[in-house]
Amino acid sequence: MEFKNKKLEQFEKDIEKKEIAVIGIGVSNIPLIDYLHEKKAEVSVFDDREEDKISKDILEKLKKYNFKCYFGKRNLDNLHGFYLIFRSPSCLPTRPELQKEADRGAIVTTEIEMLIKMCPAKVIGVTGSDGKTTTTTLTARILEDAGYKVYLGGNIGIPLFTKLNEIKPEDLIVLELSSFQLMNMNISPDIAVITNITPNHLNIHKDYQE
């Protein structure tokens, strides 16, 4: 019997015609933008860069999709009234505009968090101050050699959220996760690997404990 991802099917029903914000036009969010367009969501795109700093190909795609676009330092002034907000890892959840929307009832999440929530396969998450990429890559290769179908993602590999319709329960997902991706995440991978912890990025995190 063909496997059907019930969580994904429900999510796709929930977002149809809903107001969704995508903050940050980065590598992981472009496939997400394509996916949301395909699923007929009402999408607004936000980016701290000025419009002339965005690639012409991306701008043409957004125009073709008829998405609302907000660029520049004050782009988040227009962030209000959304059902769901996808933030890029570089857009910290501590930003007042995001906190205000969350208090209002919006779901503030990331592509990675939604992937883990709806993934039918076991997820192995690798984080730490150093050695993440090496550990993640080696883990994926070892599991592949053992005969598993492995999807490699997170900070490396490909954005996996749009692959959810392909992933089967017997597969394995290996993710490299940064501290920024883990901030405010309310779900854990099935297996968590921490390479080490040192006081990095304290210019961004409020303290070592965070």
Report the location of each language-model feature.
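Phosphate-binding loop of NTP-binding sites
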Residues: 76-82, 89-210
